[in-house]
Amino acid sequence: MLAAHKEMRAKMAAMRSADGNGAQGQGAPPAGSGRSSGQGSGQGSGQGAGPRSIFTTLKGGLQQLIDALEGRLNPQWIRKSTSVDGLERDRDGWRLRTGERGEFYDAVILASPAWAAGKLLAATDAALADELSAIPYSSSITVNLVFDESQLGPLPDGFGFLVPAVEGRAMLACTFVHRKFVGRTPVGKAVLRAFLGGAKNEALLDQSDEVLVATVRRELSEILGARIIGPHIPAEATQVSRWRRAMAQYAVGHQERMKRVKEHMSALQGLRLAGNAYDGIGIPDCIRTGRQAARELVAEKQSVTAGR
C-alpha cells in the first residue's frame, strides 16, 4: 500500500508539472485555447471565469466512451444483455458458454469484476478462482438532487466536501456538480450529488429511494445549514443510483495476491485479466490493462504460430 501511495503521489506531481494544477495532465486543453473540457468555476453555475478544475470528464458523460468503442467494432462482435455462464479450456483455445450455446475462441480477456472472473475460472483453476474471489469489493450509492440555484443559499467555495467517518453519517461526500464540470447543468440550476455506502455501510443499498433522498436532504441541511439547503427548499428532480460490488478494495496484501494470480495465469495460455481490480482503479488504469492484455495475447499467438 505504501508503494501504491508513493506511485500516486508521483503521478500527481507529474500532472501538476504539466500545467500547474494538473488540469492539462488530466486531458484538459491548454490555457487560453478557448476550449473547455471539465473546467470548473468556484462560483455559481460554473459558466463564468474562475479557477480551472483538476477534474475532467467527457462533456456528454462517460457513456460517450463506451459508445465510441462500440462504434469502432463490428456489430456482429457485440453481445449485449448476454450472461456468460461458463468458461473452460478447449484444445488450443477457450470455450465460452452463454445459456445453451457454446462458442470457441482462440483467446479471452476477462474484463469483468474479479469476483465474476473467479466464478468463471472455478472449474479451470480452483486456486486462482479463490484468489480472485477473495479480492474485496464495496458498493456505492449516488443521490442526485437538482435545485433552482436562486432558491439555495450561498454554498461554500469549492467543488464539494468530504464527510469524516468519525461523524457517523450515511453520506461519504457531496459534489457540487454544477461547479465541478462546466456545461453539465443548465444555467441557473444547481446539482448536488451525494455519495453513500462504502464497505462499512452496505445495508444502505436495501433502503428505498425515498428514504435515501430524505437521509441526504437531512444531512445536507445539518452540514451546510438549513438556510442554505433546508427541507423547505424543493428539489426539482432526484435520481438514486446503486452500484453493487463495484469498487475493488486494495487491502493489505494485495500486491502479494497479485503475484500469486500472475503465477496461476502464466499457465493459462490464451487468457488474460483486465479491469480495476488488479493494478489501478482509475479509467486510465483500466484502459492500460486492457491494451496490455490484448498486446500480450497477440504476441503469444504469433509466438505459438511461429513455433509450428
Which residue ranges define each predicted feature?
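Mid-domain catalytic core of redox enzymes
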Residues: 80-210, 218-224, 263, 307-308
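Short FAD-binding loop at a beta-strand-to-alpha-helix junction that anchors the flavin cofactor
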Residues: 192-193, 262-281, 286-289
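FAD-binding beta-loop-beta segment adjacent to the flavin cofactor pocket
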Residues: 182-187, 242-273
